[in-house]
Amino acid sequence: MSYIEEIYGREILDSRGNPTVEVEVLLEDGSMGRAAVPSGASTGAFEAVELRDGDKGRFLGKGVLQAVANVNEVIAPELEGLNPFDQPAIDRELIALDGTENKGKLGANAILGVSLANAKAAAECVGLPLYQYLGGVNAKELPVPMMNILNGGQHADNNVDIQEFMIMPVGAKSFAEALQMGTEVYHSLKAVLKEKSLATAIGDEGGFAPSLESNADALLAIMDAIQRAGYTPGKDIALALDVAATELYRDGKYHLEGEGLTKTADEMIAYYEDLVEKYPIVSIEDGLSEEDWEGWKKLTEKLGSKIQLVGDDLFVTNPARLARGIKEKCANSILIKLNQIGTLTETLDAIEMAKRAGYTTVISHRSGETEDVTMAHVAVAVNAGQIKTGAPARTERVAKYNELLRIEEELGETGVYPGHEALGR
């Protein structure tokens, strides 16, 4: 048995040039785990708190020296000497040290960094890749990628209201083939946009962010790109949306400012029904606001048997909010973001609860990412079946895809790529 010898936190930069927390956990035998914490742009009101310094004279107030100090001065002395293999006990200790509902005292960024680095140190100590350490012999399902290839909303400076237009290579036979298909469509989309004299600058997650007239224009451009790449929309490559509707919600209405429209929840649902009828859309994330439980119930009644309805801001990876959603029959899928709840154990608990209720799970990055690939391992460890980690561009996104290629190679014939089945409908 090797115990925790040292825990060390530092401030590094994420993909948006903002500071974030990185933590190293060192064990007595020399094993070391390192984890860097991501950060979101469109954040749910019910997420665990990311601690920022607020000192405007340093990184425009976005420094994380306080969170780093909490790792080094508060957490480290309490955890050093403990058993790293008892992840639930480590995470319980972290939660108790913080003592708040939302991890606002020490910061979810400090807590998650320690939680993940600890699991990675333990995995290294026993000579296992993280996915196998967490998931055992049953960890064998590669996730279908949801590739965000066209951006609007909070992730881009343009007039498209829907935040993410994604492609899912559901017709692929392996993860490697899925990555190839998605990448070919991505390059094809660039050519389509260039022909229309539209911008091919990329957003936070690697997707293009052209100024289009409407959401329908975005969908048509992607359909064109899929066909030009030699694939059949729906059969080979399906479409998925992240509306991030909480960002559009004010005074009980949804404001689609790019299109100059204001809609009620019922009108939004009718709008989605129309889109699903016209395009091969298999998944809609955050179609309604995180506060609009009644609307979510109706949306699920109308579309829940046809497509995947993913709760992100609605659930914020929180078992208590997920339990309410299950009880009230809201959504049929949960987006899992490690930093929304703040510890690995709570994340795994949320995934377990979702699976028991028949909800699908999608492991997700944040718009502010790092080269850390922990989420790729978590996706395989829990057989999530789906991963959302951006376009096949920008190293912090591609790092996750490349790690999944390595994992698929390592799994060999035991590895499974679920394709259409990942959606569970």
Curated annotation (Swiss-Prot):
GO terms for cellular component: cell surface; extracellular region; phosphopyruvate hydratase complex. Pfam families: Enolase_C, Enolase_N. Binds a second Mg(2+) ion via substrate during catalysis. Its cofactor is Mg(2+). It catalyses: (2R)-2-phosphoglycerate = phosphoenolpyruvate + H2O. It is found in: Cytoplasm; Secreted; Cell surface. PROSITE patterns: ENOLASE. This is Enolase 2.
